[in-house]
């Protein structure tokens, strides 16, 4: 979607803008869980899934490559930062592998449709839902292979439904507003 605003810019400018936005989204993915845990306690991450929204935004705004990158880097950077700076890893080491795969899928799948969302921002609603289903399917498959029971996994999915609903509303709303702003800016140039 940011390509809309960068159509007349050089490749170097496009890459610089996309890299900057990606870094900001990774920082957001590290910061939002900290805020959620400070407000809602230890279970807030599982309920609100705050690290997932920046990957969805990255995919929709920047495309699949950047969405995948933000999705993979977010839990890794969060793990490293919280381990070194706070002394308590978040996500926990046992959760890191599936979160890398799951959040990476969120960014990848939402990014596969970024060009279509740019043309018709209303499509961001089904795109976010598809990315969420894909990511949760990866979560389920990975953890079943790792030997966790379906019942405990289903409980985890149900716990995160509040966050999924919130993302399904907020991410498309942000995409629609940004698309309108970018189109308005493009017309005024």
What are the language-model segments listed below?
Residues 2-66:
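Hydrophobic transmembrane alpha-helices
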Residues 26-30, 74-76, 132, 136:
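Residue-level recognition of pore/gate-forming positions within transmembrane alpha-helices
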Residues 37-45, 83-100, 112-189:
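Membrane-embedded alpha-helical hairpins and interfacial helices in multi-pass inner-membrane proteins
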Residues 52-56, 99-107, 164, 168:
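Alpha-helical transmembrane segments of multi-pass membrane proteins
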Residues 62-66, 77-82:
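Interfacial segments of multi-pass membrane proteins
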Residues 68-73, 126:
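Hydrophobic alpha-helical membrane segments of integral membrane proteins
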